[in-house]
UniProtKB/Swiss-Prot annotation:
Chain sites annotated for binding substrate: H7, R45, Y114
Organism lineage string: Bacteria, Pseudomonadati, Pseudomonadota, Betaproteobacteria, Burkholderiales
Protein name: 5-hydroxyisourate hydrolase
Major enzyme class: hydrolase
Note: HIU hydrolysis also occurs spontaneously, but more slowly.
Function: Catalyzes the hydrolysis of 5-hydroxyisourate (HIU) to 2-oxo-4-hydroxy-4-carboxy-5-ureidoimidazoline (OHCU).
EC number annotated for this UniProt entry: 3.5.2.17
Length: 117
């Protein structure tokens, strides 16, 4: 059964990115269709897969990570506008039966991702 998961690591603080808002979109005809918004838990993870089973279909998706709000809530001084406010990751799902883990490693000045397991 396929599933889509994520987690957030705050590389500036060396801690999980807890209570960070994430919005999932599916891209259909070049338009973003919102699917759900969740918040990470104390471990920087979502309580459940973002999508699983029949809900995960082949196609293009985006995850919006509200990193500016996360850092402001943590008391980090950011410029106005913030260098990174919303980090958007666009990725493709070719095999809807596979596990797609799309983590975000982030600081106020940089981010990276990879396809995890």
């Amino acid at each position: 059964m396929g599933r889509l998961t994520t987690h957030v690591l705050d590389t500036a603080a060396g801690t999980p990115g807890k209570d960070l808002a994430i919005t999932l979109f599916k891209i259909v005809n070049n338009l973003r269709q919102p699917i759900k918004t969740v918040r990470t838990n104390h471990d920087g993870r979502c309580e459940a897969p973002l999508l699983e089973g029949e809900a995960l279909q082949a196609g293009i998706y985006e995850l919006d990570f509200a990193v500016g709000d996360y850092y402001r809530a943590a008391g980090v001084s950011l410029p106005d506008p913030a260098f990174l406010d919303v980090v958007t990751l666009r990725f493709g799902v070719a095999d809807a039966g596979a596990h797609y883990h799309v983590p975000l490693l982030v600081s106020p000045w940089s981010y990276s991702t990879y396809r995890g397991s």
